[in-house]
């Protein structure tokens, strides 16, 4: 067995911007492994179930816990320790940023999907890689067996800063479609009891899959950024176990839906950095989901003051150093789970 399959992550990192060759391996249990590119592995059971599952990591290369989880699941599949019932596509999205140990090399990849990679005059390898990721997702979903099928995409991340709600997921804008009760239960089984509802289209990987392919797709934040080997894997055990169950079991049983177990937030404000002189009005170590009250100053964008518009307005993803025109701060307010349009 060559290095492609003996150590898929290491081989991927050796080919950080891609590999033109493809590789195939059929396991003794009949499962077919197809490597389409560095970091791109399709797993096809001999008799696939009705689900098509995309598991992506390393859109940001320093978010190592999801990379370790995907690495271990892949290794166990190859060693035939992990059964696979449903077609699964693993994507290690940005290997060059893994090697650099940084969030990205030149540009934030999670702002480059839904065709954003081709807009404007800027061109770089991250944009090229994002375009390839889109193509691989399309190829995977479009090559599924005929019949009634369900599509899933969980884009796994960890956050830069601490969070008062350690694990949370971003539910892409649904364009008026109802939310999935079963997906909230799946996330809860992963240890993710907090969900943020996007209120508009975005250029994230999960929104791309949701919008273009009607997939159940989420950006899943599983904790905080740590270097390789320093993640407390016990904190990620529920997520890893549930992801393993997703690809191995025909159906998952979550029991009755209990709204009070879920903490749901919707966007209140998106504050973009439009001026070079942008400053957040709180310390760098203030945690995600810290609450502010109406009228409290959140940031200065040049000479424009940005205030909280609601009592109980929580901050998410503050980053004063983003590129001009990008989001520097998101704020959210809680909404009752019972108020959602759920199916």
From Swiss-Prot:
Pathway: Amino-acid degradation; L-arginine degradation via AST pathway; L-glutamate and succinate from L-arginine: step 5/5. Binds 1 zinc ion per subunit. The active site is at 221. Its cofactor is Zn(2+). It is an enzyme of class 3 (hydrolase). It catalyses: N-succinyl-L-glutamate + H2O = L-glutamate + succinate. The keyword Transmembrane helix does not apply. Keywords: Arginine metabolism, Hydrolase, Metal-binding, Zinc. Its EC number is 3.5.1.96. GO terms for biological process: arginine catabolic process to glutamate; arginine catabolic process to succinate. Signal peptide: none annotated. SUPFAM superfamilies: Zn-dependent exopeptidases (SSF53187). It comes from the Bacteria. Zn(2+) binds at residues 60, 63, 157. GO terms for molecular function: hydrolase activity, acting on ester bonds; succinylglutamate desuccinylase activity; zinc ion binding. InterPro entries: AspA/AstE_fam (IPR050178), AstE_AspA_cat (IPR055438), Aste_AspA_hybrid_dom (IPR007036), SuccinylGlu_desuccinylase (IPR016681). Transforms N(2)-succinylglutamate into succinate and glutamate. Belongs to the AspA/AstE family. Succinylglutamate desuccinylase subfamily. PANTHER family: ASPARTOACYLASE, SUCCINYLGLUTAMATE DESUCCINYLASE. This is Succinylglutamate desuccinylase. It comes from Idiomarina loihiensis (strain ATCC BAA-735 / DSM 15497 / L2-TR). The gene is astE.
């Amino acid at each position: 067995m060559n290095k492609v399959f003996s150590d898929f992550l290491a081989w991927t990192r050796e080919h950080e911007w891609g590999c033109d060759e493809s590789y195939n391996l059929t396991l003794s249990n009949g499962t077919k492994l197809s490597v389409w590119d560095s970091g791109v592995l399709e797993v096809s059971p001999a008799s696939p179930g009705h689900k098509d599952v995309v598991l992506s990591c390393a859109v940001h290369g320093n978010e190592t816990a999801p990379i370790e989880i995907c690495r271990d699941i892949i290794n166990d599949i190859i060693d035939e320790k992990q059964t696979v019932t449903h077609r699964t596509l693993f994507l290690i999205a940005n290997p060059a940023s893994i090697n650099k140990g940084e969030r990205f090399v030149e540009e934030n990849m999670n702002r480059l999907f839904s065709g954003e990679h081709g807009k404007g005059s800027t061109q770089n390898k991250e944009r090229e890689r994002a375009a390839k990721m889109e193509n691989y997702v399309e190829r995977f979903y479009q090559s599924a067996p005929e019949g009634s099928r369900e599509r899933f995409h969980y884009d796994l991340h960890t956050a830069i800063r601490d969070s008062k709600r350690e694990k949370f997921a971003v539910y892409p804008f649904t364009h008026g479609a109802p939310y999935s009760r079963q997906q909230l239960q799946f996330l809860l089984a992963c240890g993710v009891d907090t969900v943020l509802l996007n209120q508009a289209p975005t250029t994230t990987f999960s929104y791309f899959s949701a919008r273009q392919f009607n997939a159940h797709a989420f950006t899943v934040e599983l904790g905080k950024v740590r270097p390789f080997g320093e993640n407390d894997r016990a904190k990620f055990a529920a997520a890893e176990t549930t992801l393993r169950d997703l690809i191995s079991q025909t159906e998952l049983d979550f029991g009755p839906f209990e709204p009070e177990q879920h903490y749901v937030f919707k966007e209140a404000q998106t504050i973009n950095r439009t001026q070079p002189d942008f400053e957040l009005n709180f310390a760098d170590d203030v945690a995600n989901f810290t609450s502010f009250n109406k009228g409290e100053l959140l940031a200065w964008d040049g000479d424009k003051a940005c205030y909280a518009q609601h009592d109980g307005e929580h901050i998410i993803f503050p980053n004063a150093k983003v590129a001009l025109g990008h989001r520097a701060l998101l704020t959210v307010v809680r909404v009752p789970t019972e108020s959602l349009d759920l199916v």
